[in-house]
Design a protein with these regions (language model features):
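Aromatic-rich, lipid-facing transmembrane alpha helices and their immediate juxtamembrane interface loops
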Residues: 1-272
Length: 272
């Protein structure tokens, strides 16, 4: 929680400071409409690195900063793997990045710090969930979720290979309906989450929804702020876009799973 408090305070300071600095050049105070540059982008994003460092210093806990660094790289890795998985079912990527891209616009070098923040969001949501529900959900449950996901993913993969071997088609390519393919694509995630919801109850369902909603909203707010600040969109969703292409309905289920992805990493790292 302190990470986000520090981030909010630093954000206000940097935003106002930028407006004042620009006013000396333009003789006009402004908080939006700046020209996009990597210096401006990293100026604002650096507040999260500083916030993570302040959190580590405040609680004499170096892991608070190391966790952030791990989340940065884990986020890029997860985003890249997910994008390749998506492309096995769809002709176009689910999103296209517009600056400092790699891998055919499936990710961006500008994404490291935002993914670090995403990891912090996941830990905050999970900690709040544990505090208010007293739930016994721990690392073993998260590992069980991953086991279920891997099993159903492998089943899906085998079905695809069998279909392609005998008919030169796959289950995904046998229909041209985008929504049908999407439902089939997300089955390993949704089935694993549904099974654990039946086993653990509604509280687990609420945790899942919280991950999806918080990530969906925060992604839009971040993208919209950058657009408001500089007039530049850093990404565009290609499927079921909403909010001017900064969000997608199709991203909600992957976002739900992303919360468990980051929390699992955090639990493993902090178990040593």
């Amino acid at each position: 929680m302190w990470f986000f408090i520090y981030s909010a305070v630093l954000f206000v300071i940097v935003w106002l400071g930028t407006g004042i600095a620009v006013s000396f050049k333009t003789n006009q105070f402004q908080l939006t409409g700046f020209k996009f540059s990597r210096k401006l982008y990293y100026l604002f994003l650096s507040i999260f690195l500083v916030a993570a460092l302040l959190e580590a210093i405040s609680f004499y806990d170096v892991n608070a900063f190391l966790d952030f660094i791990i989340f940065m790289f884990a986020g890029i890795l997860g985003e890249t793997v997910f994008s390749f998985w998506w492309r096995t079912f769809f002709a176009k990527p689910i999103w296209s990045y517009k600056a400092d891209t790699f891998g055919g616009e499936i990710s961006s070098m500008l994404n490291f710090i935002p993914w670090g923040v995403s990891g912090k969001f996941a830990v905050m949501i999970w900690s709040t969930y544990r505090q208010f529900t007293g739930s016994g959900v721990d690392l073993s449950i998260f590992l069980l979720l991953w086991l279920l996901f891997i099993v159903f993913f492998l089943v899906q993969l085998v079905l695809e290979l069998v279909m392609k071997l005998f008919s030169k088609k796959t289950l995904a390519s046998s229909t041209h309906r985008e929504l049908s393919i999407y439902i089939y694509f997300t089955l390993p995630i949704t089935v694993a989450l549904i099974l654990l919801t039946f086993a653990l109850g509604l509280n687990f369902f609420f945790l899942t929804v919280a991950f999806g909603v918080v990530y969906f909203v925060s992604e839009f707010l971040f993208g919209y702020f950058i657009f408001l600040l500089s007039g530049k969109k850093l990404w565009q969703y290609n499927f079921m876009p909403v909010n001017g292409g900064l969000s997608s309905i199709y991203a909600i289920i992957p976002f739900c799973f992303a919360g468990f992805y980051f929390t699992t990493i955090w639990l493993i790292v902090n178990s040593f």
